């Protein structure tokens, strides 16, 4: 089992963890239906940028 040779300081530990923060998803509202969706993704009704791109 691996055992550290020297103790890492709180500063080094926190600097390593600085990239671990979570970000919220970029959510947009559709122009036609008012439905929320992820940016650059088609809505559940098949609309993308105000145009119908998928017919069900």
Curated annotation (Swiss-Prot):
<feature type="compositionally biased region" description="Basic residues">
    <location>
        <begin position="7"/>
        <end position="16"/>
    </location>
</feature>
<dbReference type="InterPro" id="IPR044957">
    <property type="entry name" value="Ribosomal_bL32_bact"/>
</dbReference>
<dbReference type="GO" id="GO:0003735">
    <property type="term" value="F:structural constituent of ribosome"/>
</dbReference>
<comment type="similarity">
    <text>Belongs to the bacterial ribosomal protein bL32 family.</text>
</comment>
<keyword id="KW-0687">Ribonucleoprotein</keyword>
<dbReference type="InterPro" id="IPR011332">
    <property type="entry name" value="Ribosomal_zn-bd"/>
</dbReference>
<dbReference type="GO" id="GO:0006412">
    <property type="term" value="P:translation"/>
</dbReference>
<protein>
    <recommendedName>
        <fullName>Large ribosomal subunit protein bL32</fullName>
    </recommendedName>
</protein>
<feature type="region of interest" description="Disordered">
    <location>
        <begin position="1"/>
        <end position="38"/>
    </location>
</feature>
<dbReference type="InterPro" id="IPR002677">
    <property type="entry name" value="Ribosomal_bL32"/>
</dbReference>
<keyword id="KW-0689">Ribosomal protein</keyword>
<dbReference type="GO" id="GO:0015934">
    <property type="term" value="C:large ribosomal subunit"/>
</dbReference>
<dbReference type="Pfam" id="PF01783">
    <property type="entry name" value="Ribosomal_L32p"/>
</dbReference>
